[in-house]
Amino acid sequence: MSRPSSTGPSANKPCSKQPPPPQTPHAPSPAAPPAAATISAAGPGSSAVPAAAAVISGPGAGGGAGPVSPQHHELTSLFECPVCFDYVLPPILQCQAGHLVCNQCRQKLSCCPTCRGALTPSIRNLAMEKVASAVLFPCKYATTGCSLTLHHTEKPEHEDICEYRPYSCPCPGASCKWQGSLEAVMSHLMHAHKSITTLQGEDIVFLATDINLPGAVDWVMMQSCFGHHFMLVLEKQEKYEGHQQFFAIVLLIGTRKQAENFAYRLELNGNRRRLTWEATPRSIHDGVAAAIMNSDCLVFDTAIAHLFADNGNLGINVTISTCCQ
């Protein structure tokens, strides 16, 4: 299934490989709140485009943070993989000469990177596994600021959600493979995805045009308020065969902790009908895939969309507010 992406007026779509020609901006709906933007989608047959500490510990002792002693650093350095310099964690396998390499790198190697000896047959190093179970390892993102040390069983789960891991480009459905720090996200969007429209204010209208385009389509725009930037996403996809649905959600260009300080409301309103969704914005670290999979966002099918649409255009009122902590 093709998956074109789209953004705001007079812009190229930010999430597609070949951006189409510029599009003349559409005027906002007369009934719109203070700020409004038209987001056009590009689909088949369409030329329009929218808008290192180590501490002796046992399993379950939890992570910690603190100064690193030379002795502890020397101990954890024994577990460093000579290829990727991450840590070799259980199950620990060695070459015939006793050298270690992590399991991820081992799958790509035909010989030991240290002595060039054979890696097969696989030999377990049970002594090092016992030592690893009594050591707290630094997070792999320690060099970018994470100070936690963790038992090896907790390390992978933490690193999947670590606030210091690189951020990926938040554009949904994009082929963009950019990664970088949180501070660099907005600069990336402004330079690599210039077509994304940004509106100022806590109350705006997200107007998606051509919602009847076939296939999977994304509409994206930015909202700036309270000193932060929020990404508004509307996706149309076939989550179940033969049943197309729309998914609308708000992401914060920020951390999960920062996101907890805000709330958002999405509202479809018209023809004496109203459909509302209120929630806490998700951090761009989490993305939209999991929220859509769990329907943890504003969800409605094409029949509902047509109740609120006007000539194939759908306006969503978006309100961002702060939460009292």
Curated annotation (Swiss-Prot):
Annotated EC: 2.3.2.27
Entry keyword set: Apoptosis, Biological rhythms, Cell cycle, Cytoplasm, Metal-binding, Nucleus, Phosphoprotein, Transferase, Ubl conjugation pathway, Zinc, Zinc-finger
GO cellular component: cytoplasm; cytosol; early endosome; neuronal cell body; nucleoplasm
Enzyme type, top EC level: transferase
Tissue: Detected in brain (at protein level).
Main location per the UniProt record: cytoplasm
Binding of Zn(2+) 1, residues: 139, 146, 158, 162
Zinc finger (RING-type): 81-116
Pro residues: compositionally biased ranges: 17-33
Chain spans, region SBD: 131-323
Biased composition (Low complexity): 34-43
Keyword Zinc in record: yes
Catalytic activity: S-ubiquitinyl-[E2 ubiquitin-conjugating enzyme]-L-cysteine + [acceptor protein]-L-lysine = [E2 ubiquitin-conjugating enzyme]-L-cysteine + N(6)-ubiquitinyl-[acceptor protein]-L-lysine
PTM: Phosphorylated at Thr-24 and Ser-29 by MAPK14, which mediates the degradation by the proteasome of EGLN3. Phosphorylated at Ser-29 by DYRK2; this increases the ubiquitin ligase activity and promotes degradation of EGLN3.
Keyword Transferase in record: yes
Residue numbers of Phosphoserine PTMs: 6, 16, 29, 69
Annotated Polar residues bias: 1-15
Subcellular location per the Swiss-Prot or TrEMBL entry: Cytoplasm; Nucleus
Subunit structure: Homodimer. Interacts with VAV1, without mediating its ubiquitin-mediated degradation. Probable component of some large E3 complex possibly composed of UBE2D1, SIAH2, CACYBP/SIP, SKP1, APC and TBL1X. Interacts with UBE2I. Interacts with UBE2E2. Interacts with PEG10, which may inhibit its activity. Interacts with PEG3 and EGLN2. Interacts with DYRK2. Interacts with SNCAIP. Interacts with NR1D1 and NR1D2. Interacts with DCC. Interacts with AXIN1.
Entry domain remark: The RING-type zinc finger domain is essential for ubiquitin ligase activity.
Protein name as annotated: E3 ubiquitin-protein ligase SIAH2
Originating species: Rattus norvegicus
